[in-house]
Swiss-Prot record:
Gene Ontology molecular function: any one: metal ion binding
Family of the protein in this entry: Belongs to the RimK family.
Cited InterPro entries: ATP-grasp (IPR011761), ATP-grasp_RimK-type (IPR013651), ATP_grasp_subdomain_1 (IPR013815), RimK (IPR023533), Rimk_N (IPR041107), Rp_bS6_RimK/Lys_biosynth_LsyX (IPR004666)
Keywords recorded for this protein, A-Z: ATP-binding, Ligase, Magnesium, Manganese, Metal-binding, Nucleotide-binding, Protein biosynthesis
EC number: 6.3.2.-
Cofactor binding note of this UniProt entry: Binds 2 magnesium or manganese ions per subunit.
Residues given in the record as ATP binding sites: 141, 178-179, 187, 211-213
GO cellular component: cytoplasm
Signal peptide positions (record): none
UniProt-recorded name of the protein: Probable alpha-L-glutamate ligase
Length: 301
């Protein structure tokens, strides 16, 4: 197979590993800088050009699209789909998963466990919004944030009111969530490929911190997940329409709660922690499922 990897930086661990795994399995793997691919949206013959030449003959595309380039990255991926190239994750699913609020709305509709979450526009509604999520302590998240940036833990109602007011004053969209104290600053990253959790790790926040992101100094370790956690992760990825996803789960007193479904999960943490060949399993998934015009989008965008 000829596989395109959409990535801005070929030196990133995840990109390198995907190229390595694909090459080892006898495929031709080409890294394409997402922002240098440009499109000709012509009737009957959609094209993508890259550094002056048309891209042709690809069987599959692996999107590694950073949050900051979601809009353009999804447009490039959609163009690949229009050309009948099989995407590891579809453009609509990636766009959907990047919208934190929409993701939670979709997950809640399917009855997947979530922390109680509030969303409001007017400062007049702040007191009731805080009550809605069972009062302080609570967590405030900027909708566009990644890697734990723009996430605030408010210990008191007074602090929560001030922070929410400040964000609203800055015209920032935020959501307010109950704080799951019993999780103890830890979450579980379940790595879903197809309809299986192929690897999972526990991420523990460093002392005095509540965000367990590895980018924030969290520490990863091996963990055995429960059948309920496994099922929750698989269902969450399915609801989002993602073939490959990193599903972040909190252990609460009332079962597993999904924090986030990540459409471009990093490979380094999970491979180093578990010793599993996650990149190889992703390529294997492509081998089994890819084929011309296999996208569910069917060129309808």
């Amino acid at each position: 197979m000829k596989i395109a990897v959409l990535s801005r930086n070929p030196r990133l661990y995840s990109t390198r590993r995907l190229v390595e795994a694909g090459t080892q399995r006898g495929h031709e793997v080409v890294v394409i800088d997402t922002l240098r691919a440009y499109m000709n949206i012509a009737s009957h013959k959609p094209q993508i050009h890259y550094r002056g030449k048309p891209l042709e003959g690809f069987d599959a595309v692996i999107p590694r699209i950073g949050a900051s380039v979601t809009f353009y990255g999804c447009a490039v991926l959609r163009q690949f789909e229009m050309m009948g190239v099989y995407p590891l994750n579809e453009s609509v699913a990636i766009a959907r998963s990047r919208d934190k609020l929409r993701s939670l709305q979709l997950l809640s509709r399917r009855g997947i466990g979530l922390p109680i979450t509030g969303f409001a526009h007017s400062p007049d509604d702040i007191p009731d919004l805080i009550q809605m999520v069972n009062g302080a302590p609570l967590v405030i998240k900027v909708l566009e944030g990644t890697q734990g940036i723009g996430v605030v833990l408010c210990e008191t109602t007074k602090a929560a009111e001030s922070v929410i007011e400040a964000f609203m004053g800055l015209k920032q969209n935020i959501m307010v969530q109950e704080y799951i104290k019993e999780a103890g600053g830890a979450d579980i990253r379940c790595f879903v490929v197809g309809d299986k959790v192929i690897a999972s790790m526990k991420r523990q926040a460093k002392p005095g911190e509540f965000r367990s992101n590895l980018h924030r100094g969290g520490v990863a370790s091996l963990i055995k997940i429960t059948p309920e956690e496994r099922m929750t992760a698989i269902r969450a990825a399915k609801v989002m329409g993602l073939s490959v996803a990193g599903v972040d789960i909190l252990r609460s007193n009332h079962g597993p709660l999904v924090m986030e479904v990540n459409s471009s999960p990093g490979l380094e943490g999970i491979e180093v922690t578990t010793g599993k060949d996650v990149a190889g399993m992703i390529i294997e998934h492509l081998e089994k499922n890819s084929g011309p015009n296999q996208t569910r989008t069917k060129g309808k965008g």
